A protein has these predicted regions:
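Bacterial Sec-dependent N-terminal signal peptides
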Residues: 1-36, 419, 427, 433
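Bacterial Sec-pathway N-terminal export signals of envelope proteins
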Residues: 19-76, 191-193, 229-275, 346, ...
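Amphipathic alpha-helical coiled-coil segments
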Residues: 41-56, 144, 148-167, 185, ...
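Transmembrane beta-barrel architecture of outer-membrane proteins
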Residues: 107-111, 154, 199, 286, ...
Length: 433
């Protein structure tokens, strides 16, 4: 009866995870690229930058406006001027009394005006700067995608480890249940004490607690993967590939400056360089053309008299309180700062690559040691189990051996997991992912 109770307890621990969903690594990465909210935000940034570039077309395209304005006045100057514009002036209108005290009159003006930029050197350079900004934002999106792919690979690797560890712990629980059954039988026969039974039960509880912890971590990792993939689900994911030691693509991989994050910084620096040139171009004159066509009439819908005017404007801001020169100086400082920040970022990432390579070597050594320790612990447990069955070993010794064997199995799996995580990091830093 007790054996059945412990078996039921073991099953009840794993019962919540029956609703599981197999998950392939590439499927997870594909869903991330389609649905991840961060990537959607990055895409909006690209669209906004493209829109900024479109706005600069105003520096090349004409501005066209139409207006219709009505007046009613007895002001001497305007009254006579409106008559001139309507082309209705007569000899009698030059009478001083009429000039000084005109009758009130109405006037309607329909105007078509056009303004055409001709030479605005700063706008040319501003468009080049915005193109570099668009490239930088696109690289930032690519970097975000690469980073999210790395996060998925790391989470997937940890999930593989947890399931392998769970299998090891599950076997350990079954082994403890069997030891408990044998110890209870030996107690019935007078070969074991009640304290031995309690000792086994305590050991079983400890292993079951480990399984609960593993199941909780699996659920948390599944939630994290769902978020990365942009999936609103509470499914528990199961890796379709088991945990194995992954090969490194190139043991002599060098740091790559062609990574998306560094390319984004390079484009950002180039954009600032173009902005510096743009501010310098504002010191040059600007040439713009303009023209307008007018209809003048006393009736609201009249198109009586008409006239046109065209011209060009050359403007040059010779001095604006030293504002332009201060802006140029500020932009130079910002450019130097951006260049130094990029250099610092590259130096830190090179250090990170060296660290990751050393971690890889250390993890390989850990795998070798963990493999030996696991084999030794397994052989030790086999010997002690045989002696325990013959009554030649204490229950405490058997429990210690079982705990050690389980620990070494998990340590071996953990070493493989850490090795694979180091590979993921190296491949990212060397742009091999």
């Amino acid at each position: 009866m007790k054996k059945h109770w412990f078996t039921f307890l073991f099953l009840s621990v794993t019962l919540p995870f029956f609703a599981q969903q197999p998950l392939e690594l590439q499927t997870a990465i594909g869903l991330m690229k389609e649905n991840n909210t961060q990537l959607k935000i990055q895409q909006h940034e690209i669209e906004l930058s493209n829109n900024e570039l479109s706005e600069t077309l105003s520096g090349f395209l004409p501005s066209v406006a139409v207006s219709h304005t009505g007046f009613y006045t007895n002001d001497p100057l305007n009254a006579f001027g409106f008559k001139l514009q309507q082309q209705i002036v007569t000899q009698a209108d030059f009478n001083p009394d009429l000039l000084n005290n005109p009758d009130a009159m109405q006037h309607f003006n329909t105007k078509l005006s056009v303004q055409q930029p001709l030479l605005n050197f700063d706008v040319f350079v501003a468009r080049k700067a915005l193109r570099e900004k668009i490239k930088a934002v696109a690289y930032q999106k690519q970097y975000a995608e690469d980073m999210l792919a790395v996060e998925i690979k790391k989470a997937y690797t940890n999930l593989q480890f947890l399931y392998e560890a769970k299998n090891a712990v599950s076997k350990g629980i079954l082994a403890y249940i069997e030891v408990l059954r044998n110890t209870q039988n030996m107690q019935t026969q007078g070969y074991a004490k009640p304290s031995d039974v309690l000792m086994v039960q305590v050991g079983l509880s400890e292993v079951q607690n480990k399984q609960i912890e593993i199941d909780n971590n699996i659920a948390n990792l599944s939630d994290y993967l769902s978020w990365l993939m942009g999936e609103e689900t509470t499914l528990i994911y199961v890796p379709t590939q088991s945990l194995t030691q992954n090969p490194l693509i190139d043991h002599n991989s060098l740091f790559s400056e062609n990574r998306a994050d560094i390319m984004a910084m390079k484009s950002g620096v180039e954009a600032q360089r173009k902005m510096l040139s743009m501010h310098k171009q504002t010191l040059l004159p600007r040439l713009n053309a303009f023209g307008e066509f007018n209809y003048q009439d006393r009736d609201i819908a009249g198109l009586g008299a008409n006239a046109y005017m065209v011209g060009a404007s050359l403007s040059w801001d010779l001095f604006n309180g030293n504002k332009t020169f201060n802006t140029i100086k500020k932009t130079k400082i910002s450019l130097s700062k951006a260049q130094d920040e990029m250099q610092l970022y590259i130096e830190k990432n090179k250090l990170e690559l060296q660290k990751s390579k050393r971690d890889l070597e250390a993890n390989q050594a850990k795998i070798n040691l963990a493999t030996t320790a696991k084999n030794q612990a397994n052989e030790t447990l086999r010997i002690i189990e045989n002696r325990y069955a013959q009554g030649l070993e204490k229950t405490a010794d058997l429990l210690v051996s079982q705990a050690t064997e389980l620990e070494k199995q998990v340590k071996h799996l953990e070493a493989i997991k850490d090795y694979n995580l180091s590979i993921i990091q190296i491949e990212f830093l060397t742009n091999k992912n």
